Amino acid sequence: MASVSELACIYSALILHDDEVTVTEDKINALIKAAGVNVEPFWPGLFAKALANIDIGSLICNVGAGGGAPAAAAPAGGAAPAGGGAAPAEEKKEEEKKEESEESDDDMGFGLFD
């Protein structure tokens, strides 16, 4: 779990990003001092250096995205025919989605003995 010092630096960096101001050690220190929080002196510099070359906006948007999905394996028989294999699979998925939506419309959440 993050300490108060870490959270103070994180929130300071987010405030600076929201105001479209460059995140620097001095600016983080100024915000922390204005908030009246006591942090160890190395935290603001550490966060400023860590966020120097990172797009904080994309970092915020991709929180929880985790690692990427593994790449799909190529078919064993070689390359698939152009456009031939993908269309039936898409049609099956669409049919399954339609069936699921029809079933969910019928089930109103009432059980037999409710």
Swiss-Prot record:
User: Which GO terms fall under molecular function for this chain's record?
Assistant: protein kinase activator activity; ribonucleoprotein complex binding; structural constituent of ribosome
| Start-end of Basic and acidic residues biased regions | 89-100
**Any Pfam family the entry gives:** Ribosomal_60s
The modified positions for Phosphoserine read S101, S104
Cite the InterPro entries for this sequence: P1/P2_N_sf, Ribosomal_P1/P2
Composition-biased stretches, type Low complexity, lie in 70-79
GO cellular component, as recorded: cytosolic large ribosomal subunit
- The primary gene name is RPLP1
Function text: Plays an important role in the elongation step of protein synthesis.
Name the GO terms of the biological process aspect.
cytoplasmic translation; translational elongation
Q: Where is this region: Disordered?
A: 68-114
Q: Which family does it belong to?
A: Belongs to the eukaryotic ribosomal protein P1/P2 family.
Q: What is this protein called?
A: Large ribosomal subunit protein P1
> Which positions make up the signal peptide?
none
Q: Which top-level group of life is the source organism from?
A: Eukaryota
User: What quaternary structure, including any partners, is listed in this protein's UniProt entry?
Assistant: Heterodimer with RPLP2 at the lateral ribosomal stalk of the large ribosomal subunit.
